[in-house]
């Protein structure tokens, strides 16, 4: 039976990214098939992102062994049915300075677990699988040092954007969903390299932006969009009947500006946007997490131990940063896992779009205070029936053919149920 969703997950693992990956990989094989995990800078540098993903697979292998030895259902059917490729991608934005969210996620992206609990991190030999160290380590030596702990994934030595295009070429059009939960740099590079192949995607599900809520990195910008605003603008532009109308201006200081898209393309990109407006209310509290995982960790679950260490850092950071986030009520928003939940349950009628979808949502790439802002036209202005250029329509906001066509997700199967459901799925209970 074909899975409901075949996906590429483009990610910058961080804490909620890891939860998103665990949710996907622990699901049923008839629900999802993770063909590629493409890594980008974001929450931390891309090398740390790679270490975090390899560590996750290392812990999953230990968890499966523990479950077998204790007579428990193994779970992780999606992972056992299809071994995903892992590819390293962009290490910096297209044309801006690198920024990270290590203030929240820790120096290593996972609450500093690699420093505080190094025994939970696999040996460094895994780097050679991805040609990152250049130390000439033989493949056999790498296999021996890893002791089988990369048996759940395929390591790619190609850039992530090339792997994205490969997966799209090897599958039928409109069968691959790209779930993008980090800066959109890898997607922008893939689209610039081969826009028609990129448009073979069924849809691109983006965790990014904020429309009616404040930002989380500036007063108006969400982190993923802010971290590479030009990349986000370029990907959003593919939803437009005329992508040139919303492409960001060229940055003359950029090392290698990406080319404009061809004047005509075969189709418009389907982009489902999950902004902070919908992701922020979906959370998990410290009390909820402890109640679910403490007995499992006490019984010896490697995964419960690992996640308990990581999330304890998150909840402590929330205590320090946000008034009201303390004790068992401290709540971690499940931004990235929500996008995976959609891929798993996309047929539910409870997933609803905004009344105005598709919306002309554009990304500001140059503003001193508004870079990364998701800009919408809140004026009560009538759109023009013709598509002629109008001197009074600055930015072509009122033209029928200009502007983006973004489908903004507004409703889900339930903010109250997701956190518990996520933990039940990951721990197989």
Residue ranges, per PLM feature:
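A conserved beta-strand->alpha-helix junction
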Residues: 86-92
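Extended, histidine- and acidic-residue-enriched regions that form the cofactor-binding/catalytic faces
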Residues: 99-101, 321
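Short, surface-exposed, charged loop/turn segments at secondary-structure junctions
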Residues: 101-104, 193-197, 218-225, 286-301
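Conformational coupling and interaction surfaces
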Residues: 3-4, 21-33, 226, 230, ...
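Active-site histidine-anchored catalytic micro-motif
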Residues: 2-68, 73, 79-82, 93-98, ...
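A residue-level signal for conserved active-site and pocket-lining positions in enzyme catalytic cores
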Residues: 86, 235, 340
